Design a protein with these regions (language model features):
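Bacterial N-terminal signal peptides
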Residues: 5-15
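Beta-strand/loop nucleic-acid-binding surfaces
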Residues: 64-88
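OB-fold/S1-family single-stranded nucleic acid-binding modules
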Residues: 53-55, 104-126
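Short, surface-exposed beta-strand/loop "edge" segments at domain boundaries and coil↔beta transitions
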Residues: 57-66, 125
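Short nucleic-acid-contacting surface segments enriched for D/E, G, S/T with interspersed K/R
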Residues: 83-99
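Boundary at the C-terminal end of the N-terminal hydrophobic targeting segment
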Residues: 19-21
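Structural detector for short beta-strands of small beta-barrel domains
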Residues: 26-59, 101
Length: 126
């Protein structure tokens, strides 16, 4: 009987996890994950350096033509247009962080490194 209880508890945990993955992310939501630095090249040869949060799958709204709604987004490109933004993120590399995604959209071009582009964000305190 104990085994059946453990199996049922496991299925419930899986269902809860799947339900959480199905919630579409919106502007103003919190993204939590590991911060990493990605270096790649644009098809025109330009070097790209991007800060990304890697997190659990998050669904994007179905109305965005650039997203694959059936597959959750796991990489979030935090735009760092200023030296201050880069300086804020650099000591957090490799760590678990949370940011408020003030603005976000599905990646549309080769300049967007990851599933979702986050042009405006705020680091949240631990």
């Amino acid at each position: 009987m104990r085994f059946v209880g453990l199996v049922v508890a496991g299925w419930i945990a899986l269902l809860i996890g799947a339900a959480q993955a199905q919630q579409p992310i919106r502007e103003g939501d919190t993204l939590t994950g590991t911060l990493r630095l990605v270096t790649t090249r644009h098809p025109n040869g330009t070097k790209l350096v991007a800060y990304q949060i890697v997190s659990e799958p998050r669904m994007m709204p179905a109305h965005d033509d650039f997203c694959d709604y059936d597959k959750g987004a796991t990489t979030f490109h935090l735009f760092t247009m200023t030296d201050a933004a880069k300086k804020q993120l650099k000591p957090l590399l490799g760590k678990q962080i949370s940011v408020k995604a003030v603005a976000l959209f599905c990646s549309e071009t080769a300049w967007h490194v990851g599933d979702v582009a986050v042009p405006q964000w705020t680091v949240l305190p631990k």
